[in-house]
Amino acid sequence: MEKRKVRMGIDVGGTYTKCVAMDNETHEIIGKDQVKTTHDDKAGVAAGVVQSFRNCLKNFNIDPSDVVFVAHSTTQATNAFIEGDVANVGIIGIAGGGLEGFLAKRQLRLKDIVLDEKVGRMIKVLNTFIKKKQLTDEVINQNIDELVSQGTDVIVASMAFGVDSMEEEQRIHDLASKKNIPVTMASDITKLYGLTRRTRTAAINASILPKMMATANATESSVRGAGVSVPLMIMRGDGGVMEINEMRKRPILTALSGPAASVMGSLMYLRASNAIYFEVGGTTTNIGVIKNGRPGVDYAKIGGHDTYINSLDVRILGCAGGSMVRISDKDVVDVGPRSAHIAGCEYACFTPEEEIVNPQIELVSPKKGDPADYCVIRLQNGKKICFTNTCAANVLGLVDEKYFAHGNANSARKAMQPVADKLGITVEELATKILDKDYDKVSSCIKSLAEKYELDHDAMKLVGCGGGAAALVPYCAKKMGLDYDIPQNAEVISSIGVALAMVRDVVERVIPNPSQEDIKELKQEAVDSAINSGADPDSIEVHVEIDAQTGKVTAIATGSTEVKATDLLKECDENEATKLVTKDFGKDVTDIKLSIKNDKFFVFEATKKGKNSVRIVDRKGFIKVQCSNAFVTKCKIENYKEVVEQLWEEQAEFRTDSVIRPDYFVCYGPRISDYSAIDLEQIYLLMDLDLGDRDKQEEIIIVASI
């Protein structure tokens, strides 16, 4: 019998560390385990990672040699910033002479980086500067020794225009490494201009290097000790994974990897290709975006400082499953941000009904400095409970029995009755007021994300994960007129995301009017980075984006740690694909038809609100593209330029002050690439990079979307 192959994903949350083991071929869950997150252990959260991993191996009889992939997300970097557990950073700045040197010296000189003003947490920064022509080994060593004598733990090498030539930074790196001092090169972290921001990003990275290297070593040796020999991968904040050796150089990339894990779970496991994604915990709700199979990404802010680190664009709201309710004599004032957990109270809907006798209102401030209008209910037996969002949703009958948030609606009613009486309304009206307060926060967040990422309301749906999902998602979806989905295994979706994550690397440069050669070089650089991060060369795909306004060109390489000879994920047939798109097209749709199919894709069209709506489904049942107004055609590669030009003119929308040109999706082989640019030549440039080397007689599918 052929040995099974197992993927293991471990997600480190604020309260629990959860491990999931999945079948590599079918993605079925073999087993799951959770332990309390080990914040206070001397090995930090790594202890919990290893514990849950070993439990999973033992409890589900997994042979360590069957494990082909093991990865974990980490809160270690984020916690280090929050708790101020950071090293002192010494910056060695380098620049030429004259005016350039004078300006660069000022830009390179960083002050201490404040992480939390209230409690005075900061990264201590020491500075030194070397003129480029004085850069000798002797001078570099003198500067390193001087910084170390002043208390430096870790070095940053940063040069003006260092992204164009890394030799000087590399020289400092090599000499510091010989002295066993951890070192970061600024142009290794990002290839973007902006000397101060690049140096600051490198300094923030350097500040957590010693701590993260110790954690990496502890985790790796424990995983090796369990008999697993495959590389240990770490989740990045942008939703990819990288090998632990890469993490030792660039630990800052792992900041915010918790929210990233849950978005990737939605993307890979739920096949969500266009969705607003919710992870509803007890205290906070993370909201992010998936558009055409890609999560929304932005630069991370750390301690309020802008960096050049890509992370998933996730908004964090202080209203969740366990949020407490604030009241006045006349109305519901607000819901959250404090949760029942903080006040040390049980949820009313999880309290036995018979205990709720003679409930009395008490108004408290859960933490010092909080307003004293948070509502707690004192029972006759002396116990204090809270009614929360989860209780309100149960009262309104919105939580199906199968969901984690399902509780006793009668218990919640009894606890809410005194407050309803005080406000002169029914319990149902009180529950509605509570959820309306959440809806105001959630809907404005969804609207701003939809605007930023140009999401089409008709194609949007809400995907709810986390234990508290059923408390908020059904209510908000109904009020916004959107479909929603709360999947099976929603409470371990983050661990699933880690287990299924791909290797990812991003290279960005500022290149005004890039040539085909420039983009080829950038693509190759992204491929090399992904290989260094652990991707198999044959599995790598590269997506290129050009920002015409800033001249920034971004190459995003994704790949897996192995190439699968056969993929046993169930093939999706025409019948199943039709069902998927019929559900996805939603209401008010007519004339659904399969307009093009080949051995890799199904392309469906339908009429909705007078427009031609399009969906592209791959053979695994992923809806890869959703367009609310588009035109579909097919042609041979030798003719693609004429077709693209024709659609460029025919599909253009002329408005009083501008012309809206189409974006293109092209299906070639097993891939779909999307192209958007403000001029046709740039579109050709990008398409030619993908199609230029393929057989001119190959048939491709082109979708032009407005």
Each model region followed by its residue ranges:
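N-terminally biased helix-coil "hinge/interface" segments that flank
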Residues: E2-I706
